[in-house]
Amino acid sequence: MRASLFIVIFVVSFITISCLSTDDEEARWIEKRGDCLPHLKLCKADKDCCSKKCKRRGTNPEKRCR
């Protein structure tokens, strides 16, 4: 009885900790994504875009996120 109680407490605490760490990763990813430029916005380098693709297309000399 006592051993099963410890096992249940351990499992519940493990699940809680893993869920909290996942939320922190998502928050960091969303925060990081807020620093990037969306599709078709003017850019200078690949790192400026959310898609990591800053390209010049067509006769227009401006580079945009693709």
Curated annotation (Swiss-Prot):
Residue ranges of the propeptide: 22-33
GO MF assignments: calcium channel inhibitor activity; toxin activity
Compartments, as annotated in UniProt: Secreted
Record-annotated disulphide pairs: C36-C50, C43-C54, C49-C65
Keywords assigned: Calcium channel impairing toxin, Cleavage on pair of basic residues, Disulfide bond, Ion channel impairing toxin, Knottin, Neurotoxin, Ryanodine-sensitive calcium-release channel impairing toxin, Secreted, Signal, Toxin
Site (Essential for stimulation of [3H]ryanodine binding to RYR1): R64, R66
Function text: This toxin stabilizes ryanodine receptor 1 (RyR1) opening in a long-lasting subconductance state (20% and 38% of the full conductance state have been found). It promotes an increase in the opening probability at intermediate concentration. Furthermore, it triggers calcium release from sarcoplasmic vesicles (68 nM are enough to induce a sharp release, and 45% of the total calcium is released after toxin (100 nM) addition) probably by acting as a cell-penetrating peptide (CPP). In addition, it has been shown to dose-dependently stimulate ryanodine binding to RyR1 (EC(50)=6.9-71 nM).
A Gene Ontology term for the protein's cellular component: extracellular region
Location, primary (coarse class): secreted
Position of the signal peptide: 1-21
Pfam families: Toxin_27
Protein name: Hemicalcin
Keyword hit for Oxidoreductase: no
